[in-house]
UniProtKB/Swiss-Prot annotation:
This is Probable D-serine dehydratase. It comes from Vibrio parahaemolyticus serotype O3:K6 (strain RIMD 2210633). The keyword DNA repair does not apply. The gene is dsdA. PANTHER family: D-SERINE DEHYDRATASE (PTHR48078:SF9), THREONINE DEHYDRATASE, MITOCHONDRIAL-RELATED (PTHR48078). NCBIfam families: D_Ser_am_lyase, PRK02991.1. GO terms for molecular function: D-serine ammonia-lyase activity; hydro-lyase activity; pyridoxal phosphate binding.
Amino acid sequence: MNKLNVEVLKKQFPLVEQLINLDEVCWFNPNVTSLEEGLPHVGLNAEDIHVASARLKRFAPYLMKAFPETKAASGLIESPVVDIPKMKAALETQYNVPIFGRLMLKLDSHLPISGSIKARGGIYEVLVHAEKLAIATGLLSESDDYSKLLSGEFRQFFQQYSIAVGSTGNLGMSIGMMSAKLGFSVSVHMSADAREWKKNKLRSHGVNVVEYEQDYGVAVEQGRKQAESDPNCFFIDDENSQTLFLGYSVAGERLKQQFDDLGIVVDERHPLFVYLPCGVGGGPGGVAFGLKVAFGDHVHCIFAEPTHSPCMLLGVHTGLHDEIAVQDIGIDNLTAADGLAVGRPSGFVGRAMERLIDGYYTVTDERMYQLLGELSEREGINLEPSALAGMMGAVHVSGSLHYQTRLQLTDERLKNATHLVWATGGGMVPEAEMSADLAKSGR
């Protein structure tokens, strides 16, 4: 995109100027619609989520044995929801905004196997591929006890095949560790933003890590090229994969069950607001889709991005989706939130979900570090920087009278609200790395 076009874009969409200036912005989409109207544009439905959920249950006996840490949840890869009242009080004081209702944290940061939200989609897509191959050759049928996949026969079978993926870190961790456990040969193409400890962990599991000096887009492209040259290589496409998307979407029905168990009501009088950090969009898009199907129009999903990588906000706001990258408007895509360092959004997710996502906001690296330290000090929970992007969501919603009026949020409905921050990663960060992050937070 040339300079003239950027000038035209700025005139057409004044918010773009603020993005270029790396300002923290918040935009509530006026074109958001009901689930009934928005769902047909997704191209997927509740039945697709049920199929994904059933598949994960089939794999549960295998996962329990392959990864004993999944035993507590009977082989399901799931995380707890916790209240964070001290953090809520700290946010109210710091930003001088009363946050009505309850502030909670969804600890995908502590998901078993790979310690991030990517354990949902990444592991699911590997399992789908493994099941497909094994059923096609008659080694497996859906009625079998899937723990048989641990046998030498299956490992030998999967060794004929390889898997490739491009990643800033967490998706590569999930896909790499799951693929290697099954017996696949796996290559993870990692962008310049990827943390060293993530590369080392993958290598320790026998994963081939290919490093790039460029950003996420280049890593994905190279992974795709590798797969094209080898008929036995399966490429997992973070930008366009409906399978990944469905792996994330199962989180909706699971959260509904958790809320039922906790006695948390979500209905017209008790709205739910969910704040999701966003990179390329697959993880938050899939989770938001699942939440919408589970809770209908009573859940409001809001995406959070770094000021240096606001790709989804830029794509949806301008309507250009994956036809524009942040670099096209002079933004460098360099952020400490490595999992969110994406310059070009998923066109599939942007177009599928734009009518169902209430809003988007950006947050600086400095603020993410500050929130990281605050959460650690107040609640004793340690996350990686990108996982804190969602923490400002309740402040934005509570401070926007315009948005509250549009949603007809009365004082009573606000008081009954649940605000859920989706913590996307950090549970497996090595101690030295976490200490360095905490030092940057000033704590």
